[in-house]
């Protein structure tokens, strides 16, 4: 027994020394795994307090990248690395990590990381690529270590993304998250080489972005009097809940994300999922209300009245302010889960159908065409301002707006159809990409989720271009995971 005790103590000491000893070794098996990792037999590079991070003089983006790398290393190791600008034609000193640009690298987001005993060089075609290489280097180092020296194995890493669009979605409509949490969320996207943050800002359960021309959207629409407990039980918490972002806060997020090479795409979901807006401005609904900011989850019959010109003017006014806040090429305008029930009985909507000569056919109702009218009108407005729309795959149920990019969430079928029609597509199939679903079939022992079953293995198995020809596959811009937040705890979302 005494011998066993001594062996256990010795093992414990060995494990302890591995985290607080003189040195530790980096591991290049990171997520996402680089395209090519080739190790050599040379001695490793010794990263320590004396290491300098060098970058080309007058390149402010690479300077910021160097500062990010120094900050990341400091966070995990406690080492304080200095950054240094290199004059044209000069070489970095031995023992330095040098950041640079190389136009010969084939992909604008690609990078090459070369590690030798006396130096590390990290080149990208653009500053974006260098930043992604920094993330690989960062992840190779233990997240927390007290080692005085980090050994980077000698070799070369080459990497580039398969898709130009790599997104993550955050729903702040159902539950609101403060600005500091949104920044942490963006940091997690950066860590995993994501380049797009889809910010879902409006919902039946809350309007989260300040629109100065319509102040009631946040005075009334950002707050609900109660929230259902669980998955649409008859129990409510009877607690007032809400919040919103000012335009200045939204611009702050755009800047924060941009510094990390992440584009923020805002979503204003229309013409459905608008109960929060209707609670603030009931005259924009088909019945005139009264409406309330919705305390439950689901799909609801009350949507914007497309026959009412005030509703269309409202959308155009909102978009005018949205494009002033968000400089992104794309604006997401929803288009999902908009029941036609109210439109079928609404005199104004029926009048619009007649005026615009919207006809039913064997595949579409006149009300389907009415939704297409709405989406196309907003698309024309945004196109005139140099922007393009993204819509959920329901926009395929009428005449697709001519230049629309389709986000396929109800499986992959909508994305396949859109690509076959020549539309650009972002694949977000719920059966692979909904991160708010259960990850175990034993739901009794998992935290509450709205439904579904998406284990990690299935996420990894997604092939976004399956069932498409080579030409059609060119329309698949990339993929995106979604978090439709029926939970309010930030810690669970981060997990």
Regions found by a protein language model. Name each.
Residues 1-8:
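Bacterial N-terminal signal peptides that target proteins for export
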Residues 295, 301-402, 411:
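Active-site neighborhood of glycoside hydrolase catalytic domains
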Residues 20-166, 383-396, 400, 485:
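Acidic, contiguous N-terminal accessory segments
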Residues 9-16:
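Bacterial N-terminal signal peptides
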Residues 274, 341-342, 390-423, 433-445:
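Substrate-binding cleft/loops of secretory-pathway carbohydrate-active enzymes
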Residues 104-313, 317-330, 377, 381, ...:
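Feature activates predominantly on carbohydrate-active enzymes
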Residues 485-495:
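Single conserved hydrophobic/aromatic residue that forms the stacking wall/gate
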Residues 413-482:
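Aromatic-lined glycan-binding groove of carbohydrate-active enzymes
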């Amino acid at each position: 027994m005494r011998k066993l005790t001594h062996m256990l103590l010795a093992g414990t000491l060995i494990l302890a020394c591995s985290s607080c000893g003189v040195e530790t070794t980096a591991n290049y098996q990171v997520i996402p795994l680089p395209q090519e990792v080739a190790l050599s037999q040379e001695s490793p590079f010794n990263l320590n307090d004396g290491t300098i991070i060098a970058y080309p003089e007058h390149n402010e983006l690479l300077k910021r990248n160097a500062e990010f790398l120094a900050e990341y290393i400091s966070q995990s190791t406690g080492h304080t690395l200095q950054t240094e600008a290199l004059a044209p034609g000069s070489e970095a000193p031995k023992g330095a990590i040098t950041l640079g640009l190389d136009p010969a690298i084939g992909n604008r987001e690609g990078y090459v990381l070369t590690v030798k005993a006396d130096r590390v060089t990290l080149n990208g075609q653009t500053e974006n690529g260098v930043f992604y290489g920094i993330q690989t280097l960062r992840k190779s180092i233990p997240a927390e270590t007290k080692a005085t020296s980090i050994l980077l194995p000698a070799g070369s890493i080459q990497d580039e993304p398969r898709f130009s669009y790599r997104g993550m979605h955050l729903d702040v409509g159902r539950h609101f998250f403060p600005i500091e949490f949104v920044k942490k969320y963006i940091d997690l996207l950066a860590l995993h080489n994501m380049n797009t943050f889809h910010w879902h800002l409006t919902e039946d359960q809350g309007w989260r972005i300040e629109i100065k021309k319509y102040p009631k959207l946040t005075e009334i629409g950002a707050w609900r009097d109660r929230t259902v407990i669980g998955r649409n039980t008859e129990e409510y918490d009877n607690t007032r809940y809400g919040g919103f972002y000012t335009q200045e806060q939204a611009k702050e997020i755009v800047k924060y994300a941009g510094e990390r090479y992440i584009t923020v795409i805002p979503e204003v979901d229309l013409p459905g999922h608008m109960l929060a807006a209707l609670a603030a401005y009931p005259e924009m609904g088909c019945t005139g209300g009264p409406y309330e900011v919705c305390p439950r989850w689901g799909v609801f019959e009350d949507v914007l009245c497309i026959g009412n010109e005030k509703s269309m003017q409202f959308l155009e006014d909102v978009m005018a302010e949205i494009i002033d806040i968000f400089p992104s090429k794309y604006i997401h305008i929803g288009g999902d889960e908009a029941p036609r029930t109210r439109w079928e009985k609404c005199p104004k909507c029926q009048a619009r159908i007649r005026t615009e000569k919207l006809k039913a056919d064997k595949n579409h109702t006149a009300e389907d065409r009415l939704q297409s009218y709405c989406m196309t009108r907003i698309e024309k407005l945004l196109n005139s301002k140099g922007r393009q729309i993204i819509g959920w795959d329901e926009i395929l149920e009428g005449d697709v707006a001519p230049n629309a990019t389709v986000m396929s969430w109800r499986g992959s079928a909508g994305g396949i159809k859109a690509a076959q029609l020549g539309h650009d597509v972002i694949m977000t199939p719920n059966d692979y990409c909904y991160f708010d679903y259960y990850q175990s079939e034993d739901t009794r022992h998992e935290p509450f989720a709205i439904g579904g079953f998406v284990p990690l293995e299935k996420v990894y198995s997604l092939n976004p271009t399956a069932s498409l020809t080579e030409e059609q596959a060119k329309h698949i811009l990339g993929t995106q995971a979604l978090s439709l937040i029926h939970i309010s705890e930030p810690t669970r979302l981060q997990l």
